[in-house]
Amino acid sequence: MDPAASSCMRSLQPPAPVWGCLRNPHSEGNGASGLPHYPPTPFSFHQKPDFLATATAAYPDFSASCLAATPHSLPQEEHIFTEQHPAFPQSPNWHFPVSDARRRPNSGPAGGSKEMGTSSLGLVDTTGGPGDDYGVLGSTANETEKKSSRRRKESSDNQENRGKPEGSSKARKERTAFTKEQLRELEAEFAHHNYLTRLRRYEIAVNLDLSERQVKVWFQNRRMKWKRVKGGQPISPNGQDPEDGDSTASPSSE
């Protein structure tokens, strides 16, 4: 603060000519009321610098002491306060409006920053929230589950397809479809001879339009059935099938 201004604030009763310079010359007629009169001019500490420049240009002879106010020009509450505390310096109420004026423009950016912060938070929340992340994770989990289920189904189908041809091929190899005529001729030959020579097996295969292997397999199965039913013993003394000697030329069925 300027030393001249501080000296003016400390002097509670400045001389009358100093205060008269700030009073309006038209206020003499209204002095009978006894009430303190404020100058009509908008001269105060809260005006802009351009107004202060015009005021100093209009009153070039004023000193810094003219800017101080007497207790008579203060409001009633402040006048009472000065009477109760004559030696106490002036309260800093003069500077409150200035500080308020300084705080108001500063509060704008702070409020703006808060609003911007909230708006930015809102933008962040709107652009990407935890719900979207969870939704994306859930969709990926569902896709992985679907893929795993498809792979399992494909593997099971492949295993089934692999098992079917093997079973069917075994069934085809084990069973041979014979006609009634073929079965009749084979049964008649088995009634006369339980074992066939290689030459006789060849003749039967040619007559019945079969292969030697098919004829051999049929006679082997028929002998096994006859043994289970009759409980007969093998005819050959060595207990070996006579056809086994000729089986070297033809592949065995088992």
From Swiss-Prot:
The keyword Acetylation does not apply. InterPro entries: HD (IPR001356), HD_metazoa (IPR020479), Homeobox_CS (IPR017970), Homeodomain-like_sf (IPR009057), MOX-1/MOX-2 (IPR042634). Residues 154-178 have a biased composition (Basic and acidic residues). Its main location: nucleus. One of its GO terms (molecular function) is chromatin binding. Residues 171-230 bind DNA. Disulfide bonds: none annotated. It is found in: Nucleus; Cytoplasm. Keywords: Activator, Cytoplasm, Developmental protein, DNA-binding, Homeobox, Nucleus, Repressor, Transcription, Transcription regulation. One of its GO terms (cellular component) is chromatin. Residues 86-178, 227-254 are annotated as: Disordered. One of its GO terms (biological process) is regulation of transcription by RNA polymerase II. Mesodermal transcription factor that plays a key role in somitogenesis and is specifically required for sclerotome development. Required for maintenance of the sclerotome polarity and formation of the cranio-cervical joints. Binds specifically to the promoter of target genes and regulates their expression. Activates expression of NKX3-2 in the sclerotome. Activates expression of CDKN1A and CDKN2A in endothelial cells, acting as a regulator of vascular cell proliferation. While it activates CDKN1A in a DNA-dependent manner, it activates CDKN2A in a DNA-independent manner. It is linked to Klippel-Feil syndrome 2, autosomal recessive: A skeletal disorder characterized by congenital fusion of cervical vertebrae. It is due to a failure in the normal segmentation of vertebrae during the early weeks of fetal development. The clinical triad consists of short neck, low posterior hairline, and limited neck movement. This is Homeobox protein MOX-1.
